[in-house]
Amino acid sequence: MTPRSFRLCAGALGLALASLCPVAQAGDYHDASLPVDERVEDLLARMTVDEKIGQLTQRLIDVGMEKDMEKFFSVIRTGSVGAYILMLEDAQYRNAMQKTAIEETRLGIPLLFGADVIHGHRTVFPLPLGLACTWDPDLVEQAQTIAAREARSMGLNWTFAPMCDLARDSRWGRVAETFGEDPYLNSLYVAASVRGFQGTNPADPGRVVACLKHFAGYSASVGGRDYNHTEIPPFIFRNFHLPPFHAGVNAGALTVMSSFNANDGIPAAADHWLLTDLLRGEWGFKGFVVSDWEGVQEVVDWGYAPDDVGAAIASLTAGNDMEMMSKTFTLLGPKIADGTLPISVVDEAVRRVLRVKFLSGIFEQPYTDPEAYAKTILAPESVALARAAVARSVVLLKNEPFLNTPPTGTPSPTPGTVPQNPSASTPAPTATPKPTPKQRAILPIASDVKRIALIGPFGDEKREMIGCWISQGKAKDVVTLATALKSRVGADGDVKIVQGCDINGSQPRTKTLTDGTVVLDKSVAPPMGVFDLPAAVRAAGESDLVIMALGEPWSWTGENASRARITLTGRQQELFDTIAAVGKPVVVVLFSGRPLALPSIFAKASAVIAAWQPGIQAGPGLVDILFGDVNPSGRLTITWPADTGQLPIYYNRYNTGRPDKGFIDYRDMSREPMFPFGYGLTYTSFSYGKAEVIPAANGKPAQIRTTITNTGDREGTEVAQLYVRQFFCPEGARPYQELRGFQRIKLRPGEKKEVTFDVTDEVLGYVGRDGKWRVDAGKFSLWIAPQANSGDPVSFTRP
């Protein structure tokens, strides 16, 4: 479609026609030298009720809708929309819509254009759960800076990110979009994301307005089912689910998205305590709140409002300023006229929206250079960072020698760790085992390995690599593992690529028994797809090493993608079991948006890598790890369950009144995870010395310190993690371990480094029931460890 020709309001068309064309009014709100609040008040005073409601309304323009742009122009001219969800990659459409808003409405208020820019725009990075496993907020800030630059060059000025929700139940599909399960670590990533998106000034070129979502408690949906209700008590709410949002507000985020859930029976979009008392009253948030998709109208479905008008009044009064997609706010005119809804409530919501529009700079810079996008996306430095992010986000879960002996029994959870209960005996420090020369771990791939079989449906699959919520990401930009592997091995080696099976498999036609007759349900497709065991077995038998690329489909992650069983899909498990029996070393690379409970794979494979959904540089980043060009340093930010039945599972649980193992285990399995929070292997090994606490002195806080030594034979990065436990809390029980600090430490072979953490009130405190930060006197345990559930606690008493 070619851009429409804009009508001229003067000249050849005549003064008569000019008088019919709306012209933006000159006024103080156009003066960029004035304080933002003065501009807001001047503009607000000029607006009609209909224009005000229009600013509180967001609509969608998606791919394909550009065929009828006049429909959008007509709506914009009425002033009945203030923002759009924009999915069109061509800036000409966005500029045309913006020009209509500015030149063909009475007040010329520009539009906000938002989209879900979650883990990259065109340059797609690992999903947020993967990025979090880098334990590097600076890297996340860099990635979001690139995403913002690319998005702004397309015409977006607002992203619905970052997600601040905790990931405590891997059945929930949106675990993929989170930064993990820990409120402290998530807070760091949320703040880093806000800085990456908005910079120091969201009006600067290449910046977009950030949006903290989903406010709040959305991820605690009962049963891990998306959109379900939540049951979060206030004390837990304040100390676990709310801190990442608070960190985002403190970092300067300009918008917040209310969530789909209803906590304690009150839908978030209509929760006055959440959106007004807490967000604005306690935290001082000055931006605006937008609902999630049709979230205001869903207040009726929850049963919290009798009809759409009631939902609109309840949500707007609660502090939900903008309505995404549903149209209940358009029904408010009569209720404003008869005084049911005070105009002051509407004015306050509009005031917040206008303030963000002024701060974002779109009054001064409303348009986008149509040529900027092509010059900005997929820049070499952006792609290079995407590759580095892959290598740093993958987590090496297992890496053992290949002994060619069949495994017996089931794998023990958490290999290489010592389960810890600070109330019981003190465990020994944890050290990553170092293989003997005769039992070299299978990774990195040895130089004498020339014949490699890459088996599995993810090996040469492009779309699966970029995952869910990809904004403008394209499969054509992806370099697959197969491509990168063949490039790395070159002519001197042999790489056999065998799909083996489909990702999802296929569902056979169902058979039912009716009156003694078997009836074939023809509405279900017959068995189809790929399942070629002979080819896979043959390739494995002819190779020195097998790499199996397995996982879950990207469409089974993200929104509305809950799972009852977090296992491999289709016939992948059968494929793995068959190949594992061939008698060759097997390295499994898992592609997923969540941890998967795969006990037989962890038992039989020599090595396992969690690759997540790695982005466009999936192949090169993984090859860097497989061949040892990069020593893995990723650490889990989510507990990896041994079985779906353990969910929800998270490291910072409570001690219970009966902490002895006999009272907290299941009858049929251990409560211990397969891998704990903070876990991850490297190609070297580290040891931790005995920790000690240095008392406070001379105005300096107390400190805890230890010495970490690289006991391996190559340089590596360790993530030293500080954990704390408070033994007595008058406000309520506290978790038996909480992360309160970490340091990434790079060490050469044999090198030692002293690691020190300050023991401040920020480390020891928590949010009290009154919403204020509280630090109690009394006994604490502190320890520095490579992961949760391990380490050597040191007693500390705060006077």
Task: Give each language-model segment a name.
Residues 1-12:
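Bacterial N-terminal signal peptides that target proteins for export
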Residues 10-20:
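Bacterial N-terminal signal peptides
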Residues 25-767, 777-788, 795, 799:
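Glycoside hydrolase catalytic-domain context in secreted enzymes
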Residues 773-774:
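Surface-exposed, short loops/turns at beta-strand junctions within beta-sandwich domains
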